[in-house]
Amino acid sequence: MQLNPAEISDLIKAKIENLSVNAEVRTRGTVISVTDGIVRIHGLSDAMQGEMLEFPGNTFGLAMNLERDSVGAVVLGEHEHIKEGDTVTCTGRILEVPVGRELVGRVVDALGRPIDGKGPINTTLTAPIEKIAPGVIARKSVDQPMQTGLKAIDSMVPVGRGQRELIIGDRQTGKTAVALDAIVNQKGTGVICIYVAIGQKASSIANVVRKLEEHGAMEHTIVVAATASEAAALQYIAPYSGCTMGEFFRDRGEDALIVYDDLSKQAVAYRQISLLLRRPPGREAYPGDVFYLHSRLLERAARVNEHEVEKLTNGEVKGKTGSLTALPIIETQAGDVSAFVPTNVISITDGQIFLETDLFNAGIRPAINAGISVSRVGGAAQTKVIKKLGGGIRLALAQYRELAAFSQFASDLDEATRKQLEHGEVVTELMKQKQFSTLNTAEMALTLWAINNGSYSDVPVAKALAFESEFLSFVRTQHPEVLEAVNASGAMSDESEKTLEAAMKSFKSSYAYQA
């Protein structure tokens, strides 16, 4: 083999000419102090607000306070190994989390790392946890229903796709149960759900995951968990991480539902961080920007129009709108909704579902107070048949409550008042629903239709739920075409009503329901 010196020299010349030496400039600083997961660093002159900082031992932190001679940062995870004098490096990147379809069916921590023991998540896509919410022009009005499968909610406080509906109540009133029912009810609808657990016991989160698996809901759900034992910084960023994962689907013309359980604990974690960073405390010792903490998160839940989706997907998806629906949960203390955080979130959201301890203890579950629960935009998104049939439900309950208060003092009641009270009792009874026993549009319409046409007037209150269940089974077996037609069209035709009237007559003649 002959070596050609000219060729070798040409090769070496070409290598030298094509050699690229990219020098990366990264600012370094020194740890001055470490206290409760808060690190003060000197020498990071060009750190950005919210930038990721790298500590020794492959630990990362978040720059939060940019002062004249130092930077205050929170450590995302364990901080025990960080000591005074350690070197800290700027990464030049804002905190990002993995996004994509690969996350569906998995349980991840606040940084998107898997914690379910099912191996790594193979996604190459990441997105920043802090994003600007869609602008006014990019949005579209809410006009599609997000069915929860709960009679009391879908008939009285309907939720639309792209809406923010607050679930508020004391501890142990069934807030999480309502949210989980909404997640389970999305099975087969193509809606991707994200459940963000903030500051909860690890055992409670494991129980939620088990329940979702049992009902086949993990197939369309991502669980983001920041347990009570984790650093306050992780509890603070968990909702933003979950929101970013949901926005991935929204921006591709799909529908997503996100549950924040609960934002009270996130506010407490943020208060802890702020006080340790020596930011001035305000009302209830919360920092001045606690309203902005929740508003910038909840404003990201929206319905975006076709042009925005087309722009975000570079023309790949055309003619589709995307939505991210938020169900934030707030825990009140002794029913005090006038506290700082509850009033903030009530003013940010598009309505609220109030759950009451007294109703819960009386066996009315979901324990929804129909009088003060509202949906400010959901009416436009309600299914036609539910809107038509459910209109009288709220009125019946409101009148019943008013009359029930007066009837305690009156000894003899006239016939009309007595009938109204009996009707109200039956409606209250029929609004009860067991957990994970959600109904589809047609089944719900069937119950509302029976209430409206007086079919329950001769049914004892104690047997109302059993009567409802048996009648549903009867129609499912004898007249499935009626249910299919209502589900397909979202309306009840005159023909369907006639069929149901005949079915009710036939059912009543064969079913022993009288006391």
Curated annotation (Swiss-Prot):
**Topology in the lipid bilayer:** Peripheral membrane protein
Predominant localisation class: membrane
GO cellular component, alphabetical, reads:
plasma membrane; proton-transporting ATP synthase complex
Which EC number(s) does UniProt give?
Answer: 7.1.2.2
The feature of type site (Required for activity) is located at 373
Q: Which SUPFAM superfamilies match?
A: C-terminal domain of alpha and beta subunits of F1 ATP synthase, N-terminal domain of alpha and beta subunits of F1 ATP synthase, P-loop containing nucleoside triphosphate hydrolases
Task: Tell me which UniProt keywords the record has, alphabetically.
Answer: ATP synthesis, ATP-binding, Cell inner membrane, Cell membrane, CF(1), Hydrogen ion transport, Ion transport, Membrane, Nucleotide-binding, Translocase, Transport
Q: Which domain of life does the UniProt lineage start with?
A: Bacteria
Q: Please indicate if the UniProt record lists ATP-binding as a keyword.
A: yes
The record's annotation in InterPro entries points to: ATP_synth_asu-like_sf (IPR023366), ATP_synth_asu_C (IPR000793), ATP_synth_asu_C_sf (IPR038376), ATP_synth_F1_a_nt-bd_dom (IPR033732), ATP_synth_F1_asu (IPR005294), ATPase_a/bsu_AS (IPR020003), ATPase_F1/V1/A1_a/bsu_N (IPR004100), ATPase_F1/V1/A1_a/bsu_N_sf (IPR036121)
Asked if the Swiss-Prot or TrEMBL record annotates the protein with the keyword Chaperone, the reply is no
Q: Where in the cell is it found?
A: Cell inner membrane
Q: Which reaction does it catalyse?
A: ATP + H2O + 4 H(+)(in) = ADP + phosphate + 5 H(+)(out)
Among the GO molecular function terms of this UniProt record, one is: proton-transporting ATP synthase activity, rotational mechanism
Which residues are involved in binding ATP?
A: 169-176
- Record's function text: Produces ATP from ADP in the presence of a proton gradient across the membrane. The alpha chain is a regulatory subunit.
* Quaternary structure and interacting proteins, as annotated: F-type ATPases have 2 components, CF(1) - the catalytic core - and CF(0) - the membrane proton channel. CF(1) has five subunits: alpha(3), beta(3), gamma(1), delta(1), epsilon(1). CF(0) has three main subunits: a(1), b(2) and c(9-12). The alpha and beta chains form an alternating ring which encloses part of the gamma chain. CF(1) is attached to CF(0) by a central stalk formed by the gamma and epsilon chains, while a peripheral stalk is formed by the delta and b chains.
The entry sums up its family as follows:
Belongs to the ATPase alpha/beta chains family.
Q: What is this protein called?
A: ATP synthase subunit alpha
